[in-house]
Amino acid sequence: MITLRQLRYLSALARHRHFGRAAQDCAVTQPALSMQVRELERAIGAELVERRPGDIALTDTGLEVARRADPDRHPRPH
């Protein structure tokens, strides 16, 4: 099941592009945020975040989910 919390966490991750800063923004621990994003990936059935040492990038699917979850903060490119 997809939760609003998971969508908020993905939106924060899209803004900050860093698990630690996104977690701080959401007032949760980094492991808690990471676990919820993984659960969201399982619920959707697709990878949403490319995890690299010291860096992350949202996949195309991740960007689309973030846009749908919070269209004011993540507008579609024109």
Language-model regions: role of each:
Residues 41-58, 63:
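A short LG(V/I)-centered, amphipathic sequence patch enriched
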Residues 7, 43-44, 65-78:
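Alpha-helical linker/hinge and terminal dimerization helices associated
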Residues 2-3, 37, 44, 53-55, ...:
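Short, structured secondary-structure boundary patches
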Residues 12, 55-58, 65, 72:
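Alpha-helix initiation/capping motif
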Residues 1-36, 50, 65:
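N-terminal short secondary-structure element
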